[in-house]
Amino acid sequence: MSADAVFCELGARTNFSFLEGAAPAEEMVVFAKKAGLAGLGIADRNSVAGVVRAHAKAKVEGYPFQPGARLVFADGTPDILAYPKNRRGWGHLCRLLSAGNLRSKKGDCTLHLADLLEWQEELLLIVMQGEGRPEPESLEVLLGTLKEHAGNRLYLGLAPHYDGFDRHDFAVLAAIARKAGIGLLATNDALYHDPHYRPLADVVTSIREHVPIAGAGFLLQKNAERHLKGPREMARLFSDYPEAIANTRKFFRELAFSLDELSHQYPDENADGETPAESLRRLVAEGAAERYPEGVPEKVMRQIDYELELIHDKKYEPYFLTVHKLVKFARSVNILCQGRGSAANSSVCFCLGITDVDPQKFTLLFDRFLSKDRDEPPDIDVDFEHERREEVIQYIYRTYGKEHAGLTAAVISYRSRSAGREVAKAFGLSEDVQSALVSSIWGWGTSPFTEEQAKGAGLDAADPLTRRVLAYASLLMNFPRHLSQHVGGFVITRDRLDEVVPIMNTAMPDRYMIEWDKDDLDELKILKVDVLALGMLTCLAKGFKLLEAHYGEPITLAEIYQDHRDAVYDMICRADTVGVFQIESRAQMSMLPRLQPREMYDLVIEVAIVRPGPIQGNMVHPYLKRREAQRRGEAVVYPSPELKAVLERTLGVPLFQEQAMQIAITAAGFSPSEADRLRRAMATFKRTGTIHTFERKMVEGMVANDYEREFAERCFNQIKGFGEYGFPESHAASFASLVYASAWLKTYYPDIFCAALLNAQPMGFYAPAQLVRDAREHGVRMLPVDINHSDWDALLEGEGAFDKNAVHPRHASMREVIKTRKAVRLGFRLVKGLKQTDMKALVARRGEGYRSVHDLWLRSGLSRSVLERLADADAFRSIGLDRRAALWAVKALDEQSAVERLPLFEGAGSDDLQIEPKVALPDMPAGEQVIHDYRTLTLSLKAHPVSFMREDFSRRGILRSRDLAATATGRWVTVAGLVLVRQRPGSANGVIFMTIEDETGIANIIVWEKTFQKYRRQVMGSRLVKVRGRLQNQSGVIHVVADHLEDITPMLGLLRREARRFGVNDRADGALRPSADAREKKKLRQLRLGLPARAAPEGEAAAQVAEVMPKGRNFH
């Protein structure tokens, strides 16, 4: 470092000063080192959310860094930069920020000067000048107050505004500092590192202030000077105040705190005077006796002893005991839960009941979970029923308190869509152009914007404004927008959590989160436990309850795992897996008939193989070929007996991360810790490229062990192909058991499976409409929502013989297997806009049933608007009212009248208080009924929208999806349907799987990358699409490989064509509202006589119908 490098920047902000700072923390560190600064302090607005990233980068760069915070006050106090001198000072800063967070709504921090005075000990403080001219009197009072508390830990900051008044302002501030007896300290108050980032700073200011850049005026920075400046430039700017420069180095040297000092202390979980080690060993022994009732195998005992010894050396016993406590609580209140991820490699976790995968059955690798040579905490993920996980979360808060337990943060960052829209708005582009720009973007990626996307949005790619929008949208991507709560990562500490990291409120009541995300915690080696939510566990829990209540068959997950049936695997092999956990996507379905799973380990492979890692590593086709060869009786040849032991279970093809590690250990002489570093390098390969550092060691190590160099290089390239997508076998094994359990339930009880899936929404790949269609194809009778029969959840009704003829022909083999005897009654939860509390009141007061709309209104206590939603959902059929008649009756209720709420009139005679004359209402046409069903329920039991277009489609040569099975492979076909799902598996050569639906079922479309680029708008924007392509039939799985796509969404207007003569508008009752108005009477006469009334124009009608049809779900 040069001799003049004596300036430390202490006023820097990063993009974690949300929409103020305009550069990432890591780039600030790198630039500061390059600029020759003696040190860098980062002080973001009321937050330390970005300091761990800077800390990690500074360690890599070997550069001095200190964490702090810029305190912004709500009481008019000028901003103050606060830096901790030591560990105690850090705890005080965290307590200070926590106090401001907890008195505010999520995302805000309300600080007062009194908070700082309470927590200022061991903090160094720099009082900053505001944007205006200095106010000597108030500033002198503030400095006097602060000096009484902070003494010589207080400085007055000098930051140039570059507005022509700096010399004057500095003189005023210097005089105030001399009078107060405190030092001056120089800072450039940097918002970004490089002056070229000034335009991006203007963009984030525009977004923050909700005004376009052209109209932002003085809200924008006056110049591009707010960047990190080198020591020479700063010395020149402060040549009149050299002490202000010198004080930055003095200040920095007084800071003796490092984030590495934050040691994690897990709460002691002692029981009856036992040490944590004694408690853990006892619980493991008890669990092992239950897991192995015929005696614990010697191999298992050795593994348990090895794991317990390592856990003891690392002092992790309290962590395992805490996770065990959470699982024990969940099971005590009948919440289904199951551990997964790398923890499934552990026999200790298996014996504690945390996981349900016996590592001895799957040749798993404990070092993948915990290693004596690896200084990083273990990571245990536990899935709970997603509707009941909150009970576990509140148990944590009750047990440990918010001062000791908090959810991990998730950093919500700008992605392609949000960045494109916000930057386009900042540059003044219209909403239509904004929507066009982002509508063609797939998913929520972070790929830079291209000229092709601009052209697709109708923009001139050569226009300078367009180029700026694309450039700054690309720069803004990955910038943090705000902090949200992680899906379930919890930090639990023995000492106060708010002295380790600030805590804050979340958007949900009675929840608290910290400011750091999981990567920050990993960097600081702070332990967390993931309390995750899994919809399939909710589905299975509800399904098991229905099975016991209606069929008298109590069952558990463990019992299903032992009940291996051919019928279940037969259904899986046919890819009849809509709704089945993990294998319901089109990509998975296309694999199932080729893989032909016949046992649990086959499902482990199925879960893992349709992943980007095996695809990138060119492992899928070799594995399938070897499996087919095995079925023909051909033997697999292995390069050595040692590798056979590693790869035999996957027929010589490495599919899992654990196998990559075992190959490195067995064939290349890696130690377990080196193999784990290889695994970590695989996980970060795309971002860091560090996997190449292992290539020489692995290849040469294998050659030294007598493997051919070509084979060694091929092995390494396969492992490298995993990239960041390599799938752990332990994770796949945990999920495979749920695959089988859900498939078992669907095989034998499709009525229960459908009801449980509907009652666990939102979850899974398909919307309720497709789950209902699939259940009907399996012979399940579906009943509509009804005020006298429905509950919030879907119910099972009736009793009778199963109608085998109701099963769709393609599921004919299931007719002798299915045990269903019930119908499924749809629940109120499907009706848009209804609240569970309202529907509970309706059910509780229903008695023997409601006799009329008026009776429902009187007895339920529900508002007229709730009854309107029920009428819109056609839920009054049991009292003889169709949708239109029910809406008429609801509109007759006087919402403003209170007379019927008086106790005197709540008797039987109150129905006569308001009597409306009966009106001859025309029946609502079938197309209009379907429109309203989709608008209120997102599905219809009456008809499919495409059925109204079939006559037109047939004339155009458009086949039904049902016809594809009888069509020869290779033939050109045309199909059309509603777009249900678009799936783009990562790195699968850009292919998109589309699922479309007509009145006879679904058709599966393959869109290759070249075709997608040509028809991007049609793929991404169509609600109703026509596809021409070649039919492909592989092992009974049918696809249409698209060659041409057409957006035919406007044809949805056909659903309204038959309704026009009735003058029906968007609301079914809108043209029929009872009124004394003469114009209304004239309309009514027209309706009775069948006279034409004004209808919406063709395009408008189609747009209205399209709006209520499903958009299609996008998945990666």
Curated annotation (Swiss-Prot):
SUPFAM superfamilies: PHP domain-like (SSF89550). GO terms for molecular function: 3'-5' exonuclease activity; DNA-directed DNA polymerase activity; nucleic acid binding. GO terms for biological process: DNA repair; DNA replication; SOS response. It comes from the Bacteria. One of its GO terms (cellular component) is cytoplasm. Its EC number is 2.7.7.7. It catalyses: DNA(n) + a 2'-deoxyribonucleoside 5'-triphosphate = DNA(n+1) + diphosphate. It is found in: Cytoplasm. HAMAP family: DNApol_error_prone. PANTHER family: DNA POLYMERASE III SUBUNIT ALPHA, ERROR-PRONE DNA POLYMERASE. This is Error-prone DNA polymerase 1. It comes from Rhizobium meliloti (strain 1021). The gene is dnaE2-1.
